[in-house]
UniProtKB/Swiss-Prot annotation:
TM spans (from-to): 30-50, 71-91, 93-113, 122-142, 167-187, 203-223, 282-302, 332-352, 358-378
Region (Disordered): 398-419, 444-487
Membrane topology: Multi-pass membrane protein
Listed Pfam families: FTSW_RODA_SPOVE
Keywords, in A-Z order: Cell cycle, Cell division, Cell inner membrane, Cell membrane, Cell shape, Cell wall biogenesis/degradation, Glycosyltransferase, Membrane, Peptidoglycan synthesis, Transferase, Transmembrane, Transmembrane helix
Gene that produces this protein: ftsW
One MF annotation (Gene Ontology) recorded for this entry: lipid-linked peptidoglycan transporter activity
Family: Belongs to the SEDS family. FtsW subfamily.
An example Gene Ontology CC term for this record: cell division site
Function comment: Peptidoglycan polymerase that is essential for cell division.
Transcription regulation is among the record's keywords: no
One record GO biological process: cell wall organization
Protein name: Probable peptidoglycan glycosyltransferase FtsW
Length: 487
């Protein structure tokens, strides 16, 4: 499935719907891809510089590890491109089978694995050597994301749903501790705790799990003598600088020599076989010595951007009602951030050494390929959300277009009938007004007639009164006067 297959329709949709849209619409998050490639490129340079002395001694070829790391980068990019073409629906439906595959790999390592430095962590398949814990981590996080989607209400409402994924984690932890690989167990435990908390687990369950996990890790450290030596050397490495604290003291000297801008590429002294595992677990010490505080800050900033993008994708996926994608993105972000913190903290003397690589930077084929595949998953999650959003825009645009066309295509008969109705109503109103005016005129005429009749009646009454007054003033006769006097 080619990228251009999706890019052309996406660009056409944006160009059609948005006049001010950019000319090129990218179907993938290019910034995330560039961040991952930048870390890989820096890792190739630092691995080449840090591994040259030991490669010259072991293989008589100073570029032995550099060539192998370059091949791993090519394979990692191929794995990321492959994952980018797999729909998220496949990961949702296949997470249980992936979990089973992870368990099979961990069991196979214990049965037919290869031991290096007292640890049985590698599984040889022909010329390829796989560290089974790396794919097992990714498969477990896929299963946990699917479980939280299927059992969300059960996880948030009762302890039974909260405890079920912990049983699966316990099975993984036992198999990993038999290798032994405590660092991977701690990373998986912290990622599980963080993901359950983000999924809405109750606080008392969250703190209970954190306390139980911390107590279990403490017990495991005290149970093994070599782990106790790591703790004591971490607390005071200078107490035994040529024994248990040797690796950490050499790492601290590398950090100290780096200063702000470092000694320059290739000018490290600690890589001259003073610092063991300089190109793997302690690659940040060599980077700090050669590139200084500025180089360390740059690498940490690149990783921080990847982690923030993963967490932002998780939040956006939840808003788009894609919970599986959200929980998987969250788990990748927590995984990357915690493993980075442990790697840098161990090399800087802040945390005990755990044997964890720096994501996308350290030498190691299994770690690099799985980390790149995880980045490919993030790109795929973002891609599907972009396609979903553009399809929504396209559907809304089509709905608006159909609405406007239906309005334009209304028949003229309907509009003429409407005009006739309006004119009829206006005529009725006019007739009603005329009738009202005529009625008012008739009322006024009747009032005027009544007023005129009243005026004429008043005139007649006044004339009658005047006539009666004039008759009362005439002289009466003597007989009347005598009668008046007699009376």
């Amino acid at each position: 499935m080619n990228t251009s297959t999706f890019a052309t329709p996406l660009r056409a949709m944006f160009a059609q719907r948005h006049d001010a849209a950019p000319a090129v619409v990218r179907p993938y998050d290019v910034s995330l891809i560039l961040l991952a490639l930048s870390l890989m490129a820096i890792g190739l340079v630092i691995v080449t510089s840090a591994s040259m002395p030991v490669a010259s001694r072991l293989f008589d070829n100073p570029f032995h590890f550099a060539i192998r790391h370059g091949i791993y980068i090519v394979l990692a990019i191929g794995a990321a491109l492959t994952v980018m073409q797999i729909p998220m629906q496949w990961w949702r439906t296949s997470n249980a089978w992936l979990l089973l595959l992870g368990l099979v790999l961990l069991i196979a390592v214990l049965l037919v694995g290869r031991s290096v430095n007292g640890s049985t962590r590698w599984l040889a398949i022909g010329p390829i050597t796989i560290q089974a814990a790396e794919p097992a981590k990714l498969f477990f996080f896929c299963y946990l994301a699917g479980y939280l989607v299927r059992r969300y209400e059960e996880v948030t409402e009762n302890i039974k749903g909260f405890a079920k994924p912990l049983v699966v984690f316990f099975a993984f932890a036992v198999l990993l501790l038999l290798q032994p690989d405590l660092g991977t167990v701690v990373v998986m435990l912290c990622t599980t705790i963080g993901l359950l908390f983000l999924a809405g687990a109750k606080l008392w369950q969250f703190f209970g799990l954190a306390f139980t996990g911390g107590a279990a890790v403490t017990f495991l450290i005290m149970f093994e003598e070599y782990r106790m030596k790591r703790i004591t050397s971490f607390l005071d490495p200078w107490a035994d600088p040529f024994g248990s604290g040797y690796q950490l003291t050499q790492s601290l000297m590398a950090y100290g020599r780096g200063d702000v801008f470092g000694q320059g590429l290739g000018n490290s002294l600690q890589k001259l076989e003073y610092l063991p595992e300089a190109h793997t677990d302690f690659i940040m010490a060599i980077l700090a010595e050669e590139l200084g505080f500025a180089g360390v800050l740059t690498v940490l900033a690149l990783m921080l951007c990847i982690v923030l993008k993963a967490m932002k994708m998780g939040s956006k996926a939840l808003q788009n009602e894609r919970p599986f994608d959200a929980y998987l993105a969250y788990s990748i972000g927590i995984w990357f951030s915690f493993q980075t913190a442990v790697n840098v903290g161990a090399s800087a003397g802040i945390l005990p050494t755990k044997g964890l690589t720096f994501p996308l930077l350290s030498y190691g084929g299994s770690s690099l390929i799985i980390m790149a595949a995880a980045v490919g998953l993030l790109v795929r999650i973002d891609f599907e959300m972009r396609v979903e959003g553009i399809q929504a825009i396209d559907r809304s645009g089509k709905a608006k277009a159909s609405t406007s066309s239906s309005r334009k295509n209304k028949p003229k008969t309907a509009s003429s009938a409407g005009k006739k109705k309006v004119s009829t109503v206006l005529d009725d109103v006019a007739y009603a007004v005329v009738d009202d005016v005529q009625d008012e005129e008739q009322d006024i005429d009747s009032i005027m007639d009544d007023f005129a009749q009243d005026e004429s009646a008043q005139t007649v009454s006044h004339q009658t009164k005047r006539a009666s007054k004039s008759t009362s003033k005439t002289p009466r006769g003597k007989d009347e006067e005598q009668e008046d006097g007699y009376v």
